[in-house]
Amino acid sequence: MAISVDQTPAGKYPAKVHAKRVAARIQELGHGDSGIIYLEGQKTHMIEDSDGEMPFRQRRNFFYLSGCPLPDSYLTYDIKADKLTIFIPPIDPASVIWSGLPLSVEEALEIYDVDAVLSTAEVNASLAHYCSAQGGKKVFAIADQVSPHITFLPFQEIDFDVLKRAVEESRVVKDSYEIALLRRANEISSKAHVAVFKAATSARNERELEAIFVGACMSSGCREQSYHPIFASGTNAATLHYQKNDEDLVDSVTGQRRLNMLIDAGAEYRNYCADITRVVPLSGKFSPESREIYDIVLEMQNSSLAMIKAGVMWEDVHSTSHRVAIRGLLKLGILRSTEDELFEKGISVAFFPHGLGHYLGMDTHDTGGNPNYADKDPKFKYLRLRGPLASGGVVTVEPGIYFCRFIIDPYLSSPDLGKYINADVLERYWSVGGVRIEDNVVVTDSGYDNLTTAPKLPEEIERLATEK
């Protein structure tokens, strides 16, 4: 099951390329072509009322310009001199007793794509030296991410406005190294999804399948998950971000095994995320109603993928997915009226309440999406990506159809909207819970490159679920 962890991109993480990209974006935004970029890594934090450390997660913007995963680190980038420096913690003899020797300055210089490595004790002196040599010009930093002991007093100008935006906009377009990391995260995660398929018919509880997924990822080199995995059986799949993952797969009241398991899970590989969703029948074969909904969602995704290329408006792709959902639900008799009227009335939102997808990278919901959560149109309110797709951007494509009583009941009871839903036909589909299919794709000038290899054809999923 394990995948060789040696299949990684050659060379160092391209921190210098990223620093230059951010500096160029700062200039494009009208903030000059010189100065110091200053960023701090995440600090070590202790669990409240305890001497134990909290789980560590490096600040993504810091990692983007350094490739350094070490806590309590700093960086500077001299834009004019094109000099990238990281500052790492020095040896603390008391810590060595418990944790061993930390990375040395010499080792760090070999590992990271930087020009210099210094001790964190030298940050202020280094900033002062820059000001003395360059006449005390500008420093770019992120507000509320500067430690109290750091001083910018020697600088003539402190810019807290542009750096965060410049880094986050630069992160949208991935270079080949980043895409290789994302592809690796997808390969490992896809294998883990297959392991879950094969265990689906024998598992007794949601947590068993989560354990199989996480274990498969860890054995292949991914110690962290991109987000809390979602293992939602039966009607739990109607909750978009179900978190419990701890219910039995046989209903305690009816004694019946639940129909399906929705698995939304992805591993994090060297700080880059996979975000994949699949649905597997817990009996080994989709029920007729489950298969009908699955086929609609698969068509929603295929229609969306066919539209993807650089420059396409994501809102248009999202709208197409809604129309495919409407046509499918009309065919089943769940909806009634015309496609256009149902689309204009927003009836499909009752069954497809979230956005079609989002940018993906070091964060699951990655930067640069420009969502508008104040949008009054419910079809677009939760769309985390707006505007034209960028070539080199990585997006998730994750349509779904859900049968959530909390969401659908207000439509059914509405004098204006209830007439569009056939409650008698709908009754047959509540037990399906929800179906979502999610892939991660790189946007290209002419189309897309799908990074996700987990099977999604229903026949193949059924075969794997019943394979001995």
UniProtKB/Swiss-Prot annotation:
Reactions this protein catalyses: Release of any N-terminal amino acid, including proline, that is linked to proline, even from a dipeptide or tripeptide
Residues noted as binding Mn(2+) 2 in the record, renumbered to the chain: 264, 275, 438
Cofactor: Mn(2+)
InterPro entries for this protein: Aminopep_P_N, Creatin/AminoP/Spt16_N, Creatinase/aminopeptidase-like, Pept_M24, X-Pro_dipept-like
Listed EC numbers: 3.4.11.9
One biological process term in Gene Ontology: proteolysis
Pfam family, one: AMP_N
Function, as annotated: Catalyzes the removal of a penultimate prolyl residue from the N-termini of peptides.
Name the UniProt record assigns to this protein: Probable Xaa-Pro aminopeptidase PEPP
Gene name in the database record: PEPP
